[in-house]
């Protein structure tokens, strides 16, 4: 069992009912989130570490509310163009050795969002998808579970816009091949990508 406590990652050996700390560097504004994925062999754990930002509140006025005649002032958290965004970094832990496997964080610069998308069936790697700020680059990558090395599987780039919310990916034979939808030539096509 793995969980976030005091901004860090802990695991509990259910059989022995013992708690172990895996990370010690999590703080309030740079913490390990609850977004995590166990490797199928339960020997590794992938987690997202988040560098948070302060709220940026803007006022909104509901001019004609149904409930009353007077306008209602509301506040919303809203990032404006150019504002600093949260940073999401993947982290990898070896459960047996109770230590973190370092990853090269330069790969994740200038990001809009990053999300874990699962592990390979044989536990050799976990995948994530990375959307660069500006939405002109979208990367599907895998992280080697032993070395922490990062390999780009798909690097979708466009001078205008990558439709990140309409993407489709399906891994065949545990990632040996990948079905991927892209508009890289101006038309929406299904591509078969070599995952090796």
Where are these regions (language model features)?
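Conserved beta-propeller blade repeats
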Residues: 1-2, 27-45, 74-82, 86-89, ...
